[in-house]
């Protein structure tokens, strides 16, 4: 015991995991592929280095499909990663391992990546938080950068306080990532609202990307909207789908980046 907690780093002693797509100096980085199962990088990515500097302790790497190329988490190297709530179902992907680790309490923080939903999709499937940060907010310099500037370092946690603290530790400009040169954003938690929550507004988008959704999910989401309204929140429904033009174009561009680098 130091006797002076204020003198300790912000994340002193906090265990964290890292998606096996990001380089770590003391653990192999396979990118989910048997071709790289023994690859040992000689240094951490910037985000991991900053977490260590903040006192956090890396406890392991989490599973990803090969080269993070799909929204399920399985590979010949690590087998099938299963949903912690129902092992007959998938946790989603490609950061399925990160979200399972966070959801099951392996650690309060899981560092992941997100290009087209890789941190957000499994977060939804596992019932935790998933944040894809603005490009450059957290430096992302490591190979395989196969999704171009669509991909970013992301965060998966159970609690918003952990998400804020980890973002602040990893964020900021770094010379290895030119997109981060103007990154100055730090997060803070707003004080708990006093009195009625009706000052809070929520945007509800019933359809996103023109994709079909299971009726059971739609029913549950609509019930959530109703519950929020009864609690006093203002819920505004979007009249248009911001991704309706053609999300397939974005996926084609990401696939082209992948094919050019693998």
What does each model-identified segment do?
Residues 1-6, 169-262:
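Amidase signature
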Residues 1-40, 68-70, 182, 193, ...:
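Short, well-ordered alpha-helical
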Residues 8-11, 52, 102, 196-197:
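Extracellular/periplasmic catalytic domains that process cell-envelope and extracellular macromolecules
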Residues 13, 19, 51, 79, ...:
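Conserved hydrophobic/aromatic pocket- or pore-lining residues that grip, position, or stack substrates
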Residues 17-19, 112, 132, 205:
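Short beta-strand segments
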Residues 20-22, 115-117, 162, 206-210, ...:
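Glycine-rich beta-alpha junction loops
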Residues 27-31, 60-61, 147-148, 203-206:
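Short beta-strands and strand-loop turn motifs
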Residues 43-170:
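Short glycine/serine-rich loop segments
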């Amino acid at each position: 015991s130091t006797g002076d907690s204020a003198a300790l780093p912000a994340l002193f002693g906090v265990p964290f995991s890292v998606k096996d797509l990001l380089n770590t100096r003391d653990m192999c980085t396979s990118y989910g592929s048997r071709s790289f199962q023994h690859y040992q990088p000689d240094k951490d990515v910037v985000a991991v280095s900053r977490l260590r500097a903040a006192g956090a302790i890396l406890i392991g790497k989490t599973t990803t499909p090969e080269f993070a190329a799909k929204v399920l988490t399985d590979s010949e190297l690590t087998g099938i990663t299963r949903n912690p709530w129902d092992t007959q179902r998938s946790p989603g992907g490609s950061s399925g391992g990160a979200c399972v680790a966070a959801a099951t309490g392996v650690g309060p923080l899981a560092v992941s990546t997100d290009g087209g939903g890789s941190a957000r999709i499994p977060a939804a499937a596992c019932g935790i938080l998933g944040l894809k940060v603005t490009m450059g907010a957290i430096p992302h310099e490591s190979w395989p950068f196969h999704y171009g500037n669509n991909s970013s370092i992301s965060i998966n946690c159970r609690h918003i306080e952990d998400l804020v603290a980890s973002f602040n530790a990893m964020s900021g400009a770094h010379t290895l990532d030119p997109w981060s040169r103007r990154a100055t954003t730090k997060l803070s938690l707003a004080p708990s609202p006093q009195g009625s929550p009706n000052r809070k507004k929520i945007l509800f988008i019933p359809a996103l990307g023109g994709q079909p959704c299971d009726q059971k999910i739609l029913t549950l989401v609509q019930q959530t909207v109703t519950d929020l309204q009864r609690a006093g929140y203002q819920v505004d429904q979007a009249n248009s789908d911001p991704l309706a033009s053609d999300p397939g174009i974005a996926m084609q561009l990401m696939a082209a980046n992948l094919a050019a680098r693998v």
